[in-house]
């Protein structure tokens, strides 16, 4: 499942990137096993649900970097990793960080991998503070 999860993350990143660019997309994870589909849809939905909170967390824990200066791919990798840590408590945070770093190295550059690693490691080190931010999070996009 771990290789499939890596492929799921890549596909989720592709859809998040396209959505960020304002493209019309049809989210489809049918290429994956039933377990992979569940993982991919939950990760995609979580990244959208937690987007504003993730941006707040990224801003808080990315030293000397304004959110606007972070590239679109890197931002989506960070959002996805934060959503994964919130959504899948059974996946060790270190695995999530490593997967995010590998995505950054593959789709951006080795330097982007180090950048992503630094921010996510800072987030993991301050996880209690991050959980408090999550507790105060109100999803303004929900239609309740």
Swiss-Prot record:
Q: Does the keyword RNA-binding apply?
A: yes
Q: Which GO terms describe its cellular component?
A: cytosol
Q: Which Pfam families match?
A: NusB (PF01029)
* Annotated InterPro entries: NusB-like_sf, NusB_fam, NusB_RsmB_TIM44
Name the keywords, alphabetized. RNA-binding, Transcription, Transcription antitermination, Transcription regulation
Name one process (GO BP) from the record: DNA-templated transcription termination
Give an example GO molecular function: RNA binding
Keyword Cytoplasm listed? no
Q: Which Gene3D superfamilies match?
A: NusB-like
Which family does this protein fall into?
Answer: Belongs to the NusB family.
Recorded hits in HAMAP family, A to Z, give:
NusB
Function, please? Involved in transcription antitermination. Required for transcription of ribosomal RNA (rRNA) genes. Binds specifically to the boxA antiterminator sequence of the ribosomal RNA (rrn) operons.
Protein name, per record: Transcription antitermination protein NusB
Native organism taxonomy: Bacteria, Pseudomonadati, Dictyoglomota, Dictyoglomia, Dictyoglomales
């Amino acid at each position: 499942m771990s290789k499939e999860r890596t492929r799921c993350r890549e596909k989720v990143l592709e859809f998040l990137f396209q959505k960020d660019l304002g493209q019309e997309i049809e989210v489809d994870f049918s290429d994956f096993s039933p377990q992979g589909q569940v993982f991919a849809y939950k990760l995609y939905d979580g990244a959208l649900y937690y987007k504003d909170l993730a941006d707040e967390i990224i801003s808080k824990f990315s030293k000397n970097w304004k959110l606007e200066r972070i590239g679109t791919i890197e931002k989506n990798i960070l959002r996805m990793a934060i959503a994964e840590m919130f959504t899948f408590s059974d996946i060790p945070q270190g695995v999530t960080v490593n997967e995010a770093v590998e995505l950054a190295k593959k789709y951006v550059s080795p330097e982007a991998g180090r950048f992503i690693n630094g921010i996510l490691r800072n987030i993991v080190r301050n996880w209690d503070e991050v959980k408090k931010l999550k507790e105060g999070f109100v999803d303004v996009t929900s239609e309740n």
